[in-house]
Amino acid sequence: MDAQAYLLQLGQAAKSSGFALANLGVMAKNRLLGRVAAELKSAFDEILAANAKDVAAARASGLGDAMVDRLLLNDDRLKGIIADIDNVISLADPIGEEFDSRLLDNGMRLCRRRVPLGVIGVIYEARPNVTVEIAVLALKTGNAVILRGGKETLESNLALAAAIRRALAGEGLPEDCVQLIDNPDRALVTGLLKLDKFVDMIVPRGGQGLQRLCAEQATIPVILGGIGICHLYLDRDADISRAANVIINAKVQRPTVCNALDTLLIHRDKLDWLPTLARALQQQGVKLVACEQSLGALAAAGIEAEAASDESFGTEWLSLTLGVKVVADIDEAIAHIRHYSSGHSEAILTDNLAAATHFMNEVNSAAVYLNASTRFTDGGQFGFGAEVAVSTQKLHARGPMGLEALTTYKWLGVGDYSCR
């Protein structure tokens, strides 16, 4: 079967299977998700063994540590993925919600009802957890889903998808509500992007190359995001006794994810404190890429750092590397963010209410924080149970995408044999 015929088969199966989900009641959907969790537990060792094959192949091919960490599943990570399903089960089902009800002058009653989008296509790279997260959120909202993971995680994704499909069959539902493209041929990606007869929305979760490909090639609405060039501005009125923990958390906790800190902007009045912070960061293995002014302050304290270029500040590091730039004031910090930010997450540390208000008003990213780490931009942290992606665009969805982002609405009008 050629690529086009294969994709058409997937699309047709997803569309027809999705009708079985669309009006499924919340109890039935939650029972299904409970069965997904049970099937994943039953296949626990099988899934880890499949992931071990992916990790071994990745290391043998010379894949970097950051990418290997992204595709790695261990006991704790897999248990966490399964536990997150219970969180989604506990969430209110948005499907069927009626809102914006109104009675028109002609006697017709109108309202909007929340309904599934239909079929969602998700293209992602080296994160096997996405296979489960996306499938669970799609099923909870009555959507069918076509998944295309990276070739680096093919064995893991096959094992995870098989468990999910067993759960669907066990509940008497079509297995094709969740389908995984098991062929690494990149032509299937561009083909999926043009499957507008069957697929209602595409969500790419990957780097700039994937985002650009989807934006340029898709004939289906695309939710762009997941690229995080995240900033934290240390204001002149920040409490430095508490600031270090936030900065270290933002950079170090999990440096390979999109909400990790990429650039620290430090007010020039706090420059004397930079060497203290730098030592604490370097103890955690962080490499500093610093502007000329901060480089001088670090060198005077005997601390090594690499000189930053303009390109450095436009880089999503996805590693234990941190850009550092000294700014004259809050407005220079805001201007820097406007120029370099991907629109993901930014933060300010300050005890000055006027500065905080100014920053929160002027910085227009998907998530803006006062005295908090950028690491909070996450569906689980926001109370969504899990997330489809973090959208950095402004239409349909913005920020972490939970259940509601996988829905649309239709207008319902009730008349009395009404004519216009």
UniProtKB/Swiss-Prot annotation:
GO terms of molecular function: glutamate-5-semialdehyde dehydrogenase activity; NADP binding
Any one biological process term the GO annotation gives: L-proline biosynthetic process
Main location group: cytoplasm
GO-annotated cellular components: cytoplasm
InterPro entries referenced in this protein's UniProt entry, alphabetically: Ald_DH/histidinol_DH, Ald_DH_C, Ald_DH_N, Aldehyde_DH_dom, G-glutamylP_reductase_CS, Glu-5-SA_DH, GPR_dom
Alphabetized PANTHER family for the sequence: DELTA-1-PYRROLINE-5-CARBOXYLATE SYNTHASE, GLUTAMATE SEMIALDEHYDE DEHYDROGENASE
Protein name per UniProt: Gamma-glutamyl phosphate reductase
Encoding gene per record: proA
